[in-house]
Curated annotation (Swiss-Prot):
Organism from which the protein derives: Pseudomonas putida
UniProt keyword list: 2Fe-2S, Alkaloid metabolism, Flavoprotein, Iron, Iron-sulfur, Metal-binding, Oxidoreductase
Enzyme Commission number, as recorded: 1.-.-.-
Alphabetical list of InterPro entries matching this protein: 2Fe-2S_ferredoxin-like_sf, 2Fe-2S_ferredoxin-type, 2Fe2S_fd_BS, Beta-grasp_dom_sf, FAD-bd_FR_type, FNR_nucleotide-bd, MRET, Riboflavin_synthase-like_b-brl
Note: It is probably a fusion between a ferredoxin and a reductase into a single ORF which encodes a functional reductase that is specifically coupled to NdmA and NdmB.
Single GO biological process annotation from the record: alkaloid catabolic process
One GO MF term: oxidoreductase activity
The name this protein goes by in its record: Oxidoreductase NdmD
Gene: ndmD
Cofactor note: Binds 1 [2Fe-2S] cluster per subunit.
PROSITE patterns: 2FE2S_FER_1 (PS00197), 2FE2S_FER_2 (PS51085), FAD_FR (PS51384), RIESKE (PS51296)
Length: 588
């Protein structure tokens, strides 16, 4: 028996199987999956299991940008599958470790494709007849057959006569069959005028799904589809009859074990936590901004959603966060923009000076601390400088789905505007404001806000800290609710606050006790005492080092926690925040 190579793309659904806010149940090689499309058009292929209690996610609710399990209400975001909300802990950030297993997914040729391995390329069409390139493509209904895929292919080969009426042929001799993709793709044609693609999906060792697409000079009529249904019933009955006979006369226990071993070989359930990416394109967007296209080596690009960022280890060793600029259909490489900061501590300078086409960089799985939330309100997108990157990603997604929105970009001058082609493509949704100083910007913002009812808009803003503070203040003054104002900082200008007095730290779970000395941060004291806390920006911006607190009088200096989270006293960003009392107890 030939081994099945799982490092390839498999069809698991048709485009029509994913209507708005639906979750589709599919099975590939014994792996159950929940397939769903978010409101930006991105498709997700997830393991059909909630990480919390194991309930099938196909029983859950597609809320537009997230999938909610119906058992305890845990919610997972489109793209990464990361948990975003736990109803039992409403005031706490979701657990970082709670993430649905995700699979690479593509939407091509009218089908949804996924893989359990690491395919080297993209899904391919089996069409090779030049006369049919411009034909009308119509997906026919998929047929589930209780038989092994090899048996179905064999029956299909032997029963082409069942399709005579479908093709309007005189006899089976007028039909031509070609097998591709290791018998998973069958192309049947009649003299170049009509063709049907059959794509075989191996659900389990004893069940397969036959997907089909007909190519015709014009839109196929009712008769063709009726005749196709009749023909596929003939194929299904014949294949299942053969399978039943084999089961009744053969001891297949050994074959079953062998097949399961073949199916599971080299399977990869989820993408890695980080990638090695090669720089395939580097473009100078402005005098101080470059864009980079980073293609993962050995893995397809993971699913992602607007507002996500990746962390990159730069050639000189710094870890920096960069927002994705990708449009919804750009699924080959991570696309980022990097501004060379005058006072760079090494990150942006290294990206500009050391990174060339061909350079390999370590990149994390995308995270989303700035999601585009589907609220049915009108999004006002406001960006300044390099803050355009996540805002542009959001705008492209909204534009593709035909949503109402507007984008305002504040820049020093036209020559300082990056991604000009992408921005121009947004048409009259784009408003560029050039050469405005801080006072002029503050004067302009009320004009933007006041033409809308405060209850009908969401505000998203990203850029320099003073600008974000100004946008937030103007929006609040206009009556826009705080929870409808969302922002992301790239960096803070303030120096990292350090302790001016010694205080004690106790770890509740281990009982360890140590002190934070004057001139040190809580994070540094933890690391010095072998307390492992993951950290990244060390400026209170990214949220990576968020740490639970049991007790202590906290002094917050971050921009990550919400006002409600700060007031709860349950969380601290140890990279910049500190304790005002003599002792802090961490829930570690």
């Amino acid at each position: 028996m030939n081994k099945l190579d799982v490092n390839q793309w498999f069809p698991i659904a048709t485009t029509e199987d994913l209507p708005k806010r639906h979750v589709f149940h599919a099975t590939l090689l014994g792996q159950e999956m929940a397939i769903w499309r978010d409101d930006s058009g991105s498709v997700n292929a997830w393991e059909n299991r909630c990480p919390h209690r194991g309930l099938r996610l196909t029983l859950g609710a597609n809320t537009g940008n997230e999938l909610r399990c119906q058992y305890h209400g845990w919610t997972y975001e489109s793209g990464t599958g990361g948990c975003t909300f736990v109803p039992a802990h409403r005031d706490a950030p979701p657990p970082n470790a709670a993430r649905v297993n995700t699979f690479p997914v593509r939407e091509k040729h009218g089908f949804i494709w996924t893989t359990l391995g690491q395919p080297p390329g993209e899904p391919i069409s089996i069409l090779d007849d030049a006369q049919l390139v411009n034909a009308v493509k119509t997906n026919l209904h998929s047929v589930v057959i209780d038989a092994d895929i090899d048996g179905v292919v064999s029956v299909l080969r032997q029963n082409l006569s069942a399709f005579i009426d479908v093709f309007g042929a005189a006899s089976a001799e007028d039909l031509h069959l070609k097998s591709m993709l290791q018998d998973r793709g069958i192309l049947v044609t009649r003299s170049g005028s009509i063709a049907i693609h059959f794509y075989m999906q191996r659900s389990t060792i004893s069940k397969c799904v036959v997907h089909a697409q007909v190519l015709t000079p014009g839109r196929p009529g009712y008769e063709l589809q009726k005749n196709y249904s009749y023909a596929m019933n003939v194929i299904r009955r014949a294949a299942e009859a053969v399978a039943t006979d084999l089961i009744s006369i053969t001891d297949i226990s050994d074959q079953t074990i062998e097949k399961l071993e073949v199916v599971r070989e080299n399977m990869t359930k989820a993408p890695p936590t980080h990638y090695i990416c090669e720089v395939v394109t580097r473009t100078q967007e402005t005098g101080d901004i470059n864009s980079y296209w980073l293609k993962p080596i050995g893995y397809p690009l993971p699913a992602f959603s607007p507002g996500m960022h990746i962390s990159i280890t730069t050639p000189e060793g710094s870890i920096r966060q960069y927002s994705l600029v990708n449009g919804p259909d750009e699924r080959e490489s991570f696309i980022i923009g990097v501004k060379k900061e005058i006072q760079s501590r090494g990150g942006s300078r290294s990206m500009h000076e050391d990174v060339k086409v061909g350079t390999q960089l370590k990149v994390t799985l995308p995270r989303n601390g700035f999601p585009l939330v589907q609220t049915r309100k009108h999004p006002i997108l406001v960006a300044g400088g390099i803050g355009i990157t996540p805002i542009l990603c959001m705008a492209q997604a909204l534009d593709q789905q035909g949503s109402s929105y507007e984008i305002h970009y504040f820049a020093r001058a036209f020559e300082h505007v990056p991604f000009q082609d992408r921005l121009t493509a947004l048409g009259d949704r784009l408003n560029v404001h050039l050469g405005l100083g801080p006072d002029e910007t503050r004067a302009k913002l009320p004009d933007i806000m006041e033409i809308h009812n405060a209850q009908d808009v969401d505000v998203y803003t990203c850029g320099p800290q003073p600008m974000i503070e100004t946008v937030s203040a103007v929006a609040l003054a206009h009556g826009i609710a705080e929870e409808s104002i969302r922002f992301e900082f790239f960096s803070k200008k303030n120096d990292v606050p350090v302790s001016d007095e010694e205080y004690e730290v106790e770890l509740k779970k281990t009982g360890q006790i140590f002190t934070v000395s004057p001139g040190s941060t809580l994070l540094q004291a933890c690391l010095d005492n072998d307390v492992r806390i993951e950290a990244s920006c060390e400026q209170g911006v990214c949220g990576t080092c968020i740490t639970p607190v049991v007790s202590g009088d906290l002094e917050h200096h971050d921009t990550y926690l919400s006002k409600k989270e700060r007031e709860s006293g349950k969380w601290i960003m140890p990279c910049v925040s500190r304790c005002k009392s003599k002792k802090i107890v961490l829930d570690l």
